[in-house]
Amino acid sequence: MLQLPVFAALPVQNVGLSVPSGIYSNMSHMRARAMNKSDFEFLYSLLEEESFDKDRIKMIRVACIGNYFTSRQCASMLSLLNFDSYRLEALEYLAPRVIDKQARDVILKEFAFVSNREKAEALLMGQKRR
């Protein structure tokens, strides 16, 4: 069972956004940083402790608030889910928070079926799931 007090212990990282100096700041130059290794290991251990995929997805959803992830971190979290349908559901929350989408192959390998890999790639490219 998901316990909300657990989330109070979940670190919400300063995303480290930097805005170029000058009169005009182009927002496209802002860059987020992925969750650091120790915080991610803590999150991963919390996810491992959950018994049900639905509870893991809820925790992933909360972890996405204020945090960013590498493709490898995203794939690690998806690997804890038992079915592609749950992986796709979790990826809906994770995809906008992945900072290195050019390395998406590591994420796509977590999907057993080609059709689901295609859906996952669409999510990573910013398309909504139907």
Task: Annotate each PLM feature.
Residues L2-R130:
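General marker for long, soluble alpha-helical cores
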